Amino acid sequence: MIRAFALLFAAIAMLAGAGHAQAQNLFQPFFEDTRDIMGGGPGFFRPGMPSGSSPIPRTTVNFAGNFAPGTIYIDTAERRLYLVLGNGQAIRYGIGVGRDGFRWSGTHRVTAKKEWPSWTPPAQMLRRRPDLPRHMVGGIDNPLGARAIYLGSTLYRIHGSNEPETIGQAVSSGCFRMTNEDVTDLYSRVRIGTPVIVRN
């Protein structure tokens, strides 16, 4: 009798475990999605979140450049952004860069940082693309994505994107695109005044 109860208990435990695994697999894609049901919002992305949606994974690499720790170094030809850590290392991120005719180089500093920024396309862009909205509030569908880091007095930014598949491509109007996960990580590591060096 006791043995029968033990076998029954073991069978129930196995079924419960299988049911739990199936439920976990069923809901896993929902919880791994980078959007929430309200369309994103401040605080949804966490610094240090894995960059699973980037075609170019974020990683720490050896870095030979002679720049102070904390410097952002952007290599547009390589389509990579480096945050210099010091001791010969940097965090390397994949980026999208300006298409032909929109790439640039120079040295600036971070002058502003915004979470879930709104977007107002500049007049030149509206002339090229009259179909664009005149203004878009921040959110998961906004082209600037989860974070924006403003460079000097230019219109250029390092920002997130609602098109993570474009990371590694030359498709922007001069800004540097990152996945929302990666730009959130970078945003948490830099401050106003951080030097930004852009090289073609």
List PLM regions with ranges.
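N-terminal pre-domains immediately preceding structured catalytic cores
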Residues: 2-200
